[in-house]
């Protein structure tokens, strides 16, 4: 019971230490969030993302009046293959050559993100670049080259364009609000951890109760500080 009470008192003491230094914690949080905001706004160059979407039609589907569950499941599994084709070396090299990009295929691949919604045969291709018009130009060229490659390699009859890429009107990164919030939370958490560590490492006796907790003895009396009474 004694250890439980001591633990409760220690926890309360830690909260008191945090509350006592709340202004310091808040000040550090404001500084770190300001640094994060300034870094995201003035240092990191914004990037724009354009997305194009395609729909792959199986060769056998043209002879049917509609889709079956088996067709949908088979098509969904093939979409993963289409993703690898889109990011293949041949496709990337052709896009770089057609657009005369000052990029290597590996650099271009780092700008591309291919996503496949669950239980669909739709492939979304996103391209990020510092110039919005360049991002849309690369995305549309990639779609055209990849479509021909998919048709020539797999047993599909057509790759239909669902959505052409258009220049983005607002940057996709950096997320200034999120970066500022992360900076604020990092300041609060980091400063709080430092305060707690310093409090736990501080073995000085600050209260009469500390003597009882440390020596496990009952305190009989307190001698006042005469200098403070003058």
Curated annotation (Swiss-Prot):
The gene is cpsC. Its main location: membrane. The keyword Cell membrane applies. The chain crosses the membrane at residues 24-44, 181-201. GO terms for molecular function: carbohydrate:proton symporter activity; protein tyrosine kinase activity. Keywords: Capsule biogenesis/degradation, Cell membrane, Exopolysaccharide synthesis, Membrane, Transmembrane, Transmembrane helix. It comes from the Bacteria. NCBIfam families: polys_exp_MPA1. Required for CpsD phosphorylation. Involved in the regulation of capsular polysaccharide biosynthesis. May be part of a complex that directs the coordinated polymerization and export to the cell surface of the capsular polysaccharide. Belongs to the CpsC/CapA family. It holds the Pfam family Wzz. PANTHER family: FERRIC ENTEROBACTIN TRANSPORT PROTEIN FEPE, TYROSINE-PROTEIN KINASE. InterPro entries: Bact_polysacc_biosynth/exp, CpsC-like, LPS_length_determ_N_term. It is a multi-pass membrane protein. The keyword Cytoplasm does not apply. Pathway: Capsule biogenesis; capsule polysaccharide biosynthesis. One of its GO terms (biological process) is polysaccharide transport. It is found in: Cell membrane. This is Capsular polysaccharide biosynthesis protein CpsC.
């Amino acid at each position: 019971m004694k250890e439980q009470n001591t633990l409760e008192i220690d926890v309360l003491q830690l909260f008191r230490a945090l509350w006592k230094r709340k202004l310091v914690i808040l000040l550090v949080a404001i500084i770190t969030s300001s640094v994060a905001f300034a870094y995201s706004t003035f240092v990191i160059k914004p990037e724009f993302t354009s997305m194009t979407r395609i729909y792959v039609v199986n060769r056998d589907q043209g002879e049917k009046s509609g889709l079956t569950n088996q067709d949908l499941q088979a098509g969904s599994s093939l979409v993963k293959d289409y993703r690898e084709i889109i990011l293949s070396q041949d496709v990337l090299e052709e896009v770089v050559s057609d657009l005369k990009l000052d990029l290597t295929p590996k650099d271009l691949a780092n700008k591309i993100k291919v996503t496949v919604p669950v239980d669909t045969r739709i492939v979304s291709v996103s391209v990020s670049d510092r110039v919005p018009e360049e991002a849309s130009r690369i995305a549309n060229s990639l779609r055209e080259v990849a479509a021909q490659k998919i048709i020539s390699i797999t047993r599909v009859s057509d790759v239909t364009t669902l959505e052409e890429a258009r220049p983005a009107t607002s940057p996709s990164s950096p997320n200034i609000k999120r970066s500022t919030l992360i900076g604020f939370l990092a300041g609060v958490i980091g400063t709080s951890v430092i305060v707690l560590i310093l409090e736990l490492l501080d073995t000085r006796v600050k209260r009469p109760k500390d003597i009882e907790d440390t020596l496990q003895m009952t305190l009989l009396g307190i001698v006042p500080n005469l200098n403070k009474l003058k």
